Structures are given as structure tokens and as C-alpha cells.
């Protein structure tokens, strides 16, 4: 008998029973459907295991189960999560924070599909202008063309011409023969009417214009039928174009069924959406193929020091003088300028330098004595730049390409000026704006423009554009609601942070208007200023109010308090976590004593330091920074302090630190190839000796990379195993315990632990290796054990467990202890780096740097290190960062988290808005000093935070 009460419960809640994925301790729990639920807890407490690896994984598995047996055969069996039962599950959509799109052609506009609607708008409602004359393009029907001919040429003798060739080289012998066979007697070649004769041909090396003379007639009512027939024929032969030549004045007019310039006769094809796509051959700029930039050879890198002579190595790709052909060629070239190889480049004429770089027109004479020949030898010289370009080509070796890369620079395409589109696409306008100009506007500015553009459209355009504009405005509004008003549609997806990518996907989902869906999000508040948090929370509530369930893995205080339901995982991380320590409303949670609730209700807090550090009295000054939206700012970075760079999203923080300061320092200390954005000067480099950029990029690109290999501790672990009696008896070397080389690894999977099944048009599927069952090594290697554990068992240990296991091996302990100190005790030593979040990758890098010796003169740069961190984890992280500063180092942190900001010694606040409204230095000083400022949004939040202490 059916229990209808059970069915009612299923409707109301998502019921999870017996979840044991990763560290989950056989938990049972319920999450109300149709609610905004926050899952919180310490890093490694089991939040992601519950939300993504249990609920989402089961939802995805059930979806695949609906496929036909034939389709499932290709997909392989998706492993069922280790859970007894999940009921009440809707279709699940996961929106994670990883920036997976590395395609340079992907932009905010293409990801959100807003650019697709803009393309449709310009194709249907755009007004075309000639790129030659700037005149508005016109197009006519055949009836209109006949009326115009009657009006303009009544009673006059005219030639009706059909254009066949426009400014192209060739002898066109075959074309003239084809025209003659069709019965036409005359052609107009380069402005002159000529009779077609047998074997007629032109100069093949010159550009030509060719029109066939369809008819020669007088425009009268009597000849109306003949004129109509001739116009139709001309249109057919000329692919929609025809020209009228006045026999008396020899003036020419152009007519077309297609869009045409009335002055020059230039014609465009009927616009379609693909004509405005930089990913389509019909729309892309022919020079840069739609990328907006080209790779050029940087002359300043080829000749970096002009005070040197070529003999001394002024030309970097050649080095110092060698007795070889290229130096003989340059020597011969310089003779005509009365110079030698020992003349400093600065004293050479500019023409000589250009010929050295780009080649000489005439052949050069190499003296017979140099080549031990009986007579002089004449050679062509193509130049250094040509040689480097040859090394860049696809068929050159990887070594040659890498060598050539050091002399290259990426520059804006000189043809499209970065617009990515061809001239034709850029000359369609709506209210004086082309599609590129719209895509460079900040989203807030574009939204305002689109709200008022209909007032400036003609009635026909307004009718056509109405629905498209409505769709674009709706989607832009969603982007505004999730705090992305400072982005532009042409912003490359590659340059977006994880938080920005996630919020774009969130806005796209809200725009899709789906209902009865379960959304699972991973820390959507990453990278958001406190000001924008409320807008994000409202967007999530809007998603809920559509009739969906929203689960958010989050640490943000505002998000927790705004939720309908909170699940707190804990009590600690790793093996000590995996339990639900609280589940209920935020109001109920504030009354409990879990670690999270104590931080929420104020019983526990991250304390403000008793006094701010004074620093070492030295400073780094960056002057005139003007990259992206920076407005020529001068910024002081006092050394020996914890510096926090703050400001709303898009205010210029990352541009200032990651794109300007960090590349300057990397170039100075490590000869980095990354070019800093424009700036005037940097002062104070003599006070520091190295820079360490601890970013959130993955540790490695493949699952073979893991915390053990990245930190270098895996080499020590392998050496430990090599020293064991069993390994010595068998004669094993360190390579035996590596999963990257043959010998000790499982050869069935190549040491991966899994096999990759390529799905062609679907994402690859990973299946555990049936031979080693994911252990990566062969049976013989796994027989060598230390304290009863094989090398595979060690890689499967959490950092916390490994610290206990290796407590008597100082060389290993010192490296893994630091991973524990930065709050990563819950991750596994051999966990593939591709499964680590951006914040986790950043902390592995931080731990690696901490385990190295420092001189007390290092600058550490961190971008949002609190990503993925609980209040307690932030406290641990700040202890680590403070240790670095206490040793005399300087730590520069880009951060929105008030717990970090209030602990800084010095704050640099950027703003006041994002995008074009930002890029200014608003205030700087201690948190107490900045809190008194009346500029921007940050001071108000700092003031509230300090008052609550």
C-alpha cells in the first residue's frame, strides 16, 4: 500500500540517508526544498563532499540513467556515490568557481549569449555606412532602379554595365573568352570601353577593374521593355550590382539590390548575424583572425642595448661575433654606410638598422677571402626579424619556438585596432554606435544606453528591435544584480577570476528562467566587496522565488544570516569532520555553540592587533600606473608591513598589483617575459631581494601533479622507501617509487590510477584502472612498506595523518607540517592538483614558500587568500602571514574580507566604483586612518568592523 504521507515528505525536503562519501560519517539529513540553504563549516569538514560529491553526483547519475542503453554504453557507468538513499531530488545544476575556459575567443558577451543577441540586433536593425566614403549605404529593387534611370538619364545614351572584377590582378584571358561566348561584344577595362577580340588578355601583375557591356541604348519610353530586360541581365551577371555609364559625359553611377555606397559603388552583402561574429570568417578581421591582437617581433628585445656594437653582441639573437655567414652579410651591408661591426649601434644610421632587422633589397657581396673561394660571392639578406619569424612557425621545433618567443610581443592588431571584426561589420551602426563600441562599454553603461536607444530609432527599426532589446536588457539586468556592472562584454573569459566566472554562470541561469531545479553553488561571494554582497544574495533569492531550491557552500557571514536554512559541518576537518553539527534556521544557529555560530554571535572573533607595525622605514613607490582603468596613480608600499589592497570589484586592485607591480618585480629579479601594464617609474627596488607571487592558478595541468610533488616532499618520501631493507634487497632506485616513469608504476594505466575514455563531443570520462584499482603502482612496488604502509597508502594519507606518521622523519615532517599550518591538514598528500580549489592551490604554494629560507627582504603577493576559508581557517592563515611579516618581509594582499582588512598594518583603497568609474587611489594608511575617510565604500565597513570589536 502506498504511504501518501511519505510522498508528501518527499515533496517538501531533500532527504539524504547514510552518506559516507570521503570523510562523511554515515550522515542522515534533510534540506527543505524551495529554500536558500547554506552549507558551512571548516575547510575539509565535508561541505563539498555533501553538496557536490553526494547530492550533485547522485543527481547527475540519475540523469545519465535516463539515457538509452546505447548512449550509456558510450558514457560508461557513473559510479554511485556512497550513500544509502536520496529522495526529493530535482534535476541538479552545479555552478562551480573554477575558471575552466582557456579559449581566447571566449568573452563575457559570448558566455552569456548577450553578444549573440547584439549580433542579431545589428543584422536586423543596423544602418550600414561605407568604409570608403562614410556615406549611408542604399539598396534598391529593380523597379526603383528603372525609375532612377528614367529620372536621371531620360533621352540620353547610356551603357549598362555589369561589374565582374574589382581591383584584382590577372591576365583574364579565359574570362574574356567566356564573355565572348555568351554573345557580348564589349567590355570596359580600367575605365575604357573595348571590343573583345580573340586571345585578348591584360597585364597579369597589375590590378584591374572589368565590367561587361550588357547593352548600349537611349533611355526612352519606347525602349522601356529593352531597358528592363538589360537591367535584369546586368543584375544577374553582376551579382546584384550594375553600373550606368553616360556615353556623353563618361560619368558613372552605381545601383544595387544589395547595400551599396552611392558614391564609390562599394557594396556589402545582406547582413546576417555571422557577419558580426569574430569567430566567423565572414565577420572576423582578416589580419588577426578575430583575436584582436597579433604577435610581432619586439625590436627593443632584438637590440636591447644600442651602446654596444654588433661585434660585442648588440643583436641579442646573434650574440657576440662569430666567424659565420650572417656576420659576413651584416659586415657587407654596413660597408655602404661606411661603418663596421665594431661601430656602436647608436652611431649607425636608422636606414642601416632597418636593413639589419628587415633585410636589404640588393644582393650583398661577400669577400672571397672570407669563404675561401676564388671569386667574390653574392647573397641575399632577409634580416634578423625574418629569421626569428621562421623560428616561430608551426613546423619549427619546440626549442626553436621557445627561443623565438623571447623576442616577440603581443600587440593590438593594427588593422582592426583590437575590435576583432572586419571593416564591413564595424560600419554598421545603431544610434551612432557600432557593435564593438557597445561591447567595450561597462555593463552598467550599456544597460543605460539600451534603455534609451529606442527613442532614437526609426519606426521600422523600433518594431524589429523591440523583442531583441527586451532580451538583452533582461540579461544585462541579471549581470548587474550579481555585482558585475564593471565588466564589459568584450572582456576575455580567460582574464576572469573564479568568482566572476561563477557569477556570470549564475546570471545566465537566472536568465534561463528554469523552475523546479536544484542549484548548487560553490562560494559565489568570492571577489565581492561587502557593498555588492546584498545584490548577490537578492539574486539567489530571486532564483529561489522562481520555484527552485538553492544550496550554497559558503563562509560569508551575510549569506548565512540571509539564508532560510543553514547546515554546519564539522566539528573539525578531515577525519575529525564529516558530521552535521547543526541544521536549522540562522536564528536557531545563533543560539548554539558550534565553532561557526560562535563567530557569528560574537563569542569568538579574530582580534585586531594591539598595535600596527611601523615597518622598516623603507618604501617601494610605483608612479604613474595607468593600465586598464588606472588613472595615473602614484602608490606607496611601505616595506616590512602587512599591506591590504581594497576596493569594490573592478576598481583596479588586480590591475595595480597583479598586472603592474608584480610583473615589474618579476622582470627585475627573474627576467620574466610578462610585460607590466603602462607605468612611469618604480622606486625602492634596492630594498628588496625577491618577489613571490602566490596566486590561485592550478599547481599543475594534469592529475599527476599533487601537493607532495609540488612541495618537493615526494622526493624525500621516495628516498625513505629506497632506504628500506626490502627495497635494498631488491635493488630499487628512487625511480621505482615514481608513478611518472616505467619500472614501479602500473603500466596498464601509465601510473595515472585511472583510464581516460575520450568522448569526442562530450567531456572525457575517467574510469578507475581495473589492474591497480587506482593505486598507480604495480604489485611488487606496493610490497615495500614503511610502518606497514606502502607508497600508495602514504599518498592516500591526509596531511594531518601524515604529520603523525612521519613525526620521526624531520626532513619530511618540516615540509608537510607547513601544509598543516596553513589549514590544509584535511587534503591528501597525493590529491590530484586538478581537484584542488583555487584557494587550496594558493595555500599549497604559500606553504611551499614558507618551507624555504627567507632573507627578510621578500615581497609576497597574494590575491584573495581567504577564498574557501572558514573564520577559524582565516585566523590560522593570518597567524602564518603575520609570521612572515614579523621576519621583516612585506606581504601585499588583495582582499575583501574584513577580518583580514582589520588586521592589516596599511590599507590601499581603490575606487570609487568599478570599471571606468574606478582606477583612483582613494585613501591609504592604517585601518583606523582609512575608516575616517569619506571617499568610497570601504571606510564605512571598516569603521563598523572596528566598532564591533
Task: Name each model feature, range by range.
Residues 1-949:
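Conserved phosphate-binding elements of NTP-dependent enzyme cores
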Amino acid at each position: 500500500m502506498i504511504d501518501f504521507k511519505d510522498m508528501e515528505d518527499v515533496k517538501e525536503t531533500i532527504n539524504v540517508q547514510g552518506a559516507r562519501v570521503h570523510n562523511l560519517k554515515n550522515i542522515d539529513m534533510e534540506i527543505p526544498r524551495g529554500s536558500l540553504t547554506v552549507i558551512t563549516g571548516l575547510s575539509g569538514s565535508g561541505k563539498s563532499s555533501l553538496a557536490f560529491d553526494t547530492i550533485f553526483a547522485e543527481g547527475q547519475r540519475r540523469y545519465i540513467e535516463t539515457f538509452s542503453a546505447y548512449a550509456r554504453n558510450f558514457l560508461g557507468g557513473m559510479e554511485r556515490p556512497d550513500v544509502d538513499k536520496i529522495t526529493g531530488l530535482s534535476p541538479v545544476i552545479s555552478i562551480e568557481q573554477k575558471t575552466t575556459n582557456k579559449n581566447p575567443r571566449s568573452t563575457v558577451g559570448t558566455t552569456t549569449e548577450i553578444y549573440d543577441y547584439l549580433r542579431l540586433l545589428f543584422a536586423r536593425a543596423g544602418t550600414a555606412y561605407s568604409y570608403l566614403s562614410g556615406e549611408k549605404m542604399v539598396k534598391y529593387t529593380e523597379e526603383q532602379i528603372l525609375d532612377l534611370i528614367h529620372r536621371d538619364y531620360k533621352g540620353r545614351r547610356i551603357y549598362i554595365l555589369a561589374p565582374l572584377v574589382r581591383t584584382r590582378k590577372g591576365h583574364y584571358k579565359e574570362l574574356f573568352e567566356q564573355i565572348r561566348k555568351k554573345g557580348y561584344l564589349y567590355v570596359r577595362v580600367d575605365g575604357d570601353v573595348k571590343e573583345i577580340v580573340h586571345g585578348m588578355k591584360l597585364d597579369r601583375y597589375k590590378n584591374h577593374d572589368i565590367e561587361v557591356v550588357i547593352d548600349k541604348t537611349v533611355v526612352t519610353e519606347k525602349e522601356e521593355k529593352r531597358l528592363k530586360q538589360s537591367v535584369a541581365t546586368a543584375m544577374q551577371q553582376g551579382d546584384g550590382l550594375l553600373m550606368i555609364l553616360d556615353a556623353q559625359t563618361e560619368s558613372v553611377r552605381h545601383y544595387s539590390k544589395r547595400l551599396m555606397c552611392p558614391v564609390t559603388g562599394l557594396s556589402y552583402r545582406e547582413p546576417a548575424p555571422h557577419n558580426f561574429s569574430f569567430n566567423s570568417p565572414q565577420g572576423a578581421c582578416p589580419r588577426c583572425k578575430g583575436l584582436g591582437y597579433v604577435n610581432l617581433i619586439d625590436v627593443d628585445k632584438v637590440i636591447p642595448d644600442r651602446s654596444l656594437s654588433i661585434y660585442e653582441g648588440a643583436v641579442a639573437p646573434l650574440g657576440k661575433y662569430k666567424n659565420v655567414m650572417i656576420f659576413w652579410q651584416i659586415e657587407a651591408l654596413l660597408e655602404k654606410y661606411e661603418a663596421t661591426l665594431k661601430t656602436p649601434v647608436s652611431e649607425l644610421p636608422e636606414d642601416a638598422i632597418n636593413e639589419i632587422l628587415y633585410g636589404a633589397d640588393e644582393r650583398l657581396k661577400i669577400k672571397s677571402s672570407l669563404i675561401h673561394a676564388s671569386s667574390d660571392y653574392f647573397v641575399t639578406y632577409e634580416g634578423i626579424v625574418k629569421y626569428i619569424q621562421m623560428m616561430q612557425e608551426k613546423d619549427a621545433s619546440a626549442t626553436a619556438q621557445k627561443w623565438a618567443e623571447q623576442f616577440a610581443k603581443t600587440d593590438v592588431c593594427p588593422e582592426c585596432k583590437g575590435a576583432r571584426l572586419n571593416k564591413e561589420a564595424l560600419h554598421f551602426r545603431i544610434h551612432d554606435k557600432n557593435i564593438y563600441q557597445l561591447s567595450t562599454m561597462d555593463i552598467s553603461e550599456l544597460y543605460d544606453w539600451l534603455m534609451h536607444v529606442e527613442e532614437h530609432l526609426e519606426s521600422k527599426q523600433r518594431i524589429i528591435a523591440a523583442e531583441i532589446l527586451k532580451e538583452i536588457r533582461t540579461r544585462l539586468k541579471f549581470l548587474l544584480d550579481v555585482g558585475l556592472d564593471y565588466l564589459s562584454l568584450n572582456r576575455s573569459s580567460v582574464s576572469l577570476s573564479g568568482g566572476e566566472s561563477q557569477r556570470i554562470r549564475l546570471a545566465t541561469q537566472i536568465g534561463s528562467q528554469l523552475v523546479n531545479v536544484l542549484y548548487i553553488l560553490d562560494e559565489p561571494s568570492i571577489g565581492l566587496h561587502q557593498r555588492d554582497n546584498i545584490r548577490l544574495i537578492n539574486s539567489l533569492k530571486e532564483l529561489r522565488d522562481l520555484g527552485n531550491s538553492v544550496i550554497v557552500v559558503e563562509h560569508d557571514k551575510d549569506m548565512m544570516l540571509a539564508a532560510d536554512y543553514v547546515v554546519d559541518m564539522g566539528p573539525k576537518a578531515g577525519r575529525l569532520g564529516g558530521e552535521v553539527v547543526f541544521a536549522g534556521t540562522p536564528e536557531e544557529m545563533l543560539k548554539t555553540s558550534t565553532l561557526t555560530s560562535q563567530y557569528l554571535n560574537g563569542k569568538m572573533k579574530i582580534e585586531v592587533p594591539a598595535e600596527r607595525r611601523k615597518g622598516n622605514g623603507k618604501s617601494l613607490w610605483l608612479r604613474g600606473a595607468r593600465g586598464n582603468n588606472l588613472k595615473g596613480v602614484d602608490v606607496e608600499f611601505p616595506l616590512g608591513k602587512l599591506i591590504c589592497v581594497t576596493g569594490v570589484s573592478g576598481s583596479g586592485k588586480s590591475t595595480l598589483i597583479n598586472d603592474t607591480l608584480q610583473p615589474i618585480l618579476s622582470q627585475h629579479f627573474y627576467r620574466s617575459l610578462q610585460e607590466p601594464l603602462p607605468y612611469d617609474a618604480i622606486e625602492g627596488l634596492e630594498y628588496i631581494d625577491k618577489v613571490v607571487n602566490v596566486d590561485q592558478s592550478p599547481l599543475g595541468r594534469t592529475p599527476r601533479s599533487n601537493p607532495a610533488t609540488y612541495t618537493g616532499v615526494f622526493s624525500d618520501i621516495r628516498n625513505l622507501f629506497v632506504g628500506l631493507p626490502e627495497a635494498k634487497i631488491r635493488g630499487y632506485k628512487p625511480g621505482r617509487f615514481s608513478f611518472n616513469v616505467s619500472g614501479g608504476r602500473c603500466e596498464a594505466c601509465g601510473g595515472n590510477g585511472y583510464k581516460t575514455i575520450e568522448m569526442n563531443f562530450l567531456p572525457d570520462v575517467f574510469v578507475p584502472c581495473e589492474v591497480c584499482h587506482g593505486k598507480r603502482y604495480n604489485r611488487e612496488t606496493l610490497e615495500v612498506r614503511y610502518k606497514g604502509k606502502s607508497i600508495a597508502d602514504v599518498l592516500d594519507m591526509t596531511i594531518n595523518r601524515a604529520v603523525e606518521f612521519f613525526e620521526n622523519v624531520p626532513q619530511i615532517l618540516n615540509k608537510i607540517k607547513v601544509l598543516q599550518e596553513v589549514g590544509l591538514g584535511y587534503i591528501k598528500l597525493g590529491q590530484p592538483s586538478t581537484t584542488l580549489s583555487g584557494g587550496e592551490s594558493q595555500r599549497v604554494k604559500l606553504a611551499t614558500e614558507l618551507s624555504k629560507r627567507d632573507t627578510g627582504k621578500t615581497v609576497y603577493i597574494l590575491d584573495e587568500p581567504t577564498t574557501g576559508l572558514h573564520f577559524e581557517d582565516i585566523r590560522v592563515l593570518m597567524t602564518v602571514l603575520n609570521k612572515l611579516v614579523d621576519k621583516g618581509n612585506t606581504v601585499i594582499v588583495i582582499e575583501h574580507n574584513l577580518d583580514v582588512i582589520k588586521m592589516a598594518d596599511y590599507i590601499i583603497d581603490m575606487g570609487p566604483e568599478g570599471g571606468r568609474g574606478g582606477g583612483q587611489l582613494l585613501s591609504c594608511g592604517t585601518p583606523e586612518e582609512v575608516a575616517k575617510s569619506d571617499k568610497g565604500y570601504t571606510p564605512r565597513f571598516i569603521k563598523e568592523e572596528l566598532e564591533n570589536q
